């Protein structure tokens, strides 16, 4: 193992500890009686009881003053001061602490509690134990070390250790997921698990990751969505199911995309996209109330209001408002492209009417949707798993929720007509043959499930990582994923 000069110095101290009979990574350690937060919260009662406590943490500050020393320990929730004197811990243990410990080491101390002349609650140490000798020193934040975003994401363990505010981001993420789970559980939804390895990928327009099962001699795909398996469970008789889990899409990496990401998908029998809109609004609002005790969240200079009724716009109205192009009047590609030209819009030409509509929306509408907004009534070819609108079959009963200029959720009244679904799959197959590598595959078993009969159903998918941006005031999902996918070091 190669060590730099600083690491070599620390390794020398590790060897000195071993020579003194002190194990730098012991198998048996003292039993912790209190976390640092618990000691601080119970301080007065513990002092009154003259209690002996054992606390543990990482050394963050250290001041040696002759025959005594002050230091701070940090753990998951805070910091606490410790005081050692040669008279109390003994000559050798004190010398070992002074000479052989470094910032970043993890230690345990045992002692009683007191308040310093400066009014700082502290532990008067009677013994200490090395728990883990740190060979790499922690970054010096005062000198701006470890402030590079990519370096922090590559070494998240250092980032978390050095930056309590980063740990708080992931605590909020965990509380968000807990709140969503609670909201659904209280309404009778059943949490389930469906396959990650799938013989046929579907449920979204995306390129999959491919793998191979050696014994079965079978190509498999990492799932791009949980949708089709969850709807099989609705066919099987469950009234409401949901799954929180990882999906995988072989696509680009940017501010709102990571190849591996977390989604929650929810399916409600005897519902539709209108009932799912209400559920979505209620669930996200509930999470905000649980975490912040408020429905108003500050995000990058915007005050995002999750209370009240959220804005609802049809895709036609949203596009017309921003561009003057009326997609209901321009239902063929040529007339749509002509209208785009007449409006003076600079936009990439797409191969089909539906994809051109989607491009119009993505370019001119989506970035402007900062407050929570439901966009409804999508072109049917963009939504092969959604029910057509009864009064206009060129569009479907679908909505997407947008906030912060990005899609947060996608939902529809689920298509339960097996014959219509088969035709949609065939259309997708033709698109795939024509070069669309994000088109869905034919799924014969799913069609068999629909033949058994699926009740009218509303379905929802929410990107947890994107929703976390709002709840943690971050601008890229790499900051709300513990270990985001990054290029190899040295690659451009």
From Swiss-Prot:
Report if keyword Nucleotide-binding is assigned.
yes
Going by the entry's taxonomy, the superkingdom of the source organism is recorded as Bacteria
Record-given protein name: Lysine--tRNA ligase
Gene name of the encoded protein:
lysS
Q: Which PANTHER family match?
A: LYSINE--TRNA LIGASE, CHLOROPLASTIC_MITOCHONDRIAL, LYSYL-TRNA SYNTHETASE
Q: Which cofactor does it need?
A: Mg(2+)
Query: Gene3D superfamilies in the record, alphabetically?
Result: Bira Bifunctional Protein, Domain 2, Nucleic acid-binding proteins
How is this protein organized at the quaternary level? Homodimer.
Q: List the disulfide bonds.
A: none
Provide any one GO MF term from the record. Answer: lysine-tRNA ligase activity
């Amino acid at each position: 193992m190669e060590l730099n000069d600083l690491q070599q110095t620390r390794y020398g101290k590790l060897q000195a500890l071993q020579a003194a009979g002190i194990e730098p990574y012991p198998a048996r350690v003292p039993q912790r009686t209190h976390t640092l937060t618990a000691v601080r919260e119970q301080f007065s009662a513990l002092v009154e009881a003259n209690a002996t406590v054992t606390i543990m943490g990482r050394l963050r500050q250290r001041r040696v003053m002759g025959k005594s020393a002050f230091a701070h320990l940090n753990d998951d929730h805070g910091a606490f001061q410790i005081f050692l004197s040669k008279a109390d811990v003994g000559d050798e243990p004190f010398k070992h602490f002074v000479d052989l410990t470094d910032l970043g080491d993890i230690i345990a101390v045992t002692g009683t509690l007191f308040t310093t002349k400066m009014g700082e609650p502290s532990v008067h140490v009677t013994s200490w134990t090395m728990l883990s000798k740190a060979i790499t020193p922690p970054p010096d934040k005062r000198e701006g070390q470890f402030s590079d975003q990519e370096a922090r994401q590559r070494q998240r363990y250092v980032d978390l250790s050095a930056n309590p505010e980063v740990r708080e981001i992931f605590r909020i993420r965990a509380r968000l997921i807990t709140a969503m789970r609670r909201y659904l559980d209280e309404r009778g939804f059943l949490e389930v698990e469906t396959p990650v390895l799938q013989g046929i990928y579907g449920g979204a327009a995306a390129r999959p990751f491919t793998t191979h099962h050696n014994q079965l001699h079978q190509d498999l795909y990492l799932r791009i969505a949980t949708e089709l398996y969850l709807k099989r469970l609705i066919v099987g008789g469950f009234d409401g199911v949901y799954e929180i889990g990882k999906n995988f899409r072989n696509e680009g990496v940017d501010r709102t995309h990571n190849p591996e990401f977390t989604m929650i998908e929810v399916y409600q029998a005897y519902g539709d996209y209108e009932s799912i809109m209400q559920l979505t609004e209620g669930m996200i609002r509930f999470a905000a109330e649980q975490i912040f005790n408020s429905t108003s969240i500050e995000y990058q200079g915007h005050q995002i209001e999750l209370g009240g009724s959220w804005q609802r716009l049809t895709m036609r109205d949203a596009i017309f408002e921003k561009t003057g192009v009326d997609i209901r009047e321009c239902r063929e590609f040529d007339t749509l492209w002509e209208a785009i030209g007449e409006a003076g819009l600079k936009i990439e030409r797409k191969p089909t009417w539906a994809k051109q509509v989607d491009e119009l929306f993505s370019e001119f509408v989506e970035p402007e949707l900062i407050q929570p907004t439901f966009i409804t009534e999508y072109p049917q070819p963009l939504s092969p798993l959604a029910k057509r609108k009864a009064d206009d079959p060129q569009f479907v009963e679908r909505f997407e929720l947008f906030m912060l200029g990005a899609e947060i959720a996608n939902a529809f009244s689920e298509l339960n007509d097996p014959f219509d679904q088969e035709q949609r799959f065939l259309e997708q197959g033709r698109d795939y043959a024509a070069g669309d590598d994000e088109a869905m595959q034919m799924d014969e078993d799913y069609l068999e499930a629909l033949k058994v009969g699926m009740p009218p159903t509303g379905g929802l998918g929410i990107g947890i990582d994107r929703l976390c941006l709002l709840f943690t005031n971050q601008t890229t999902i790499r900051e709300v994923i513990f270990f985001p996918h990054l290029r190899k070091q040295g690659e451009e």
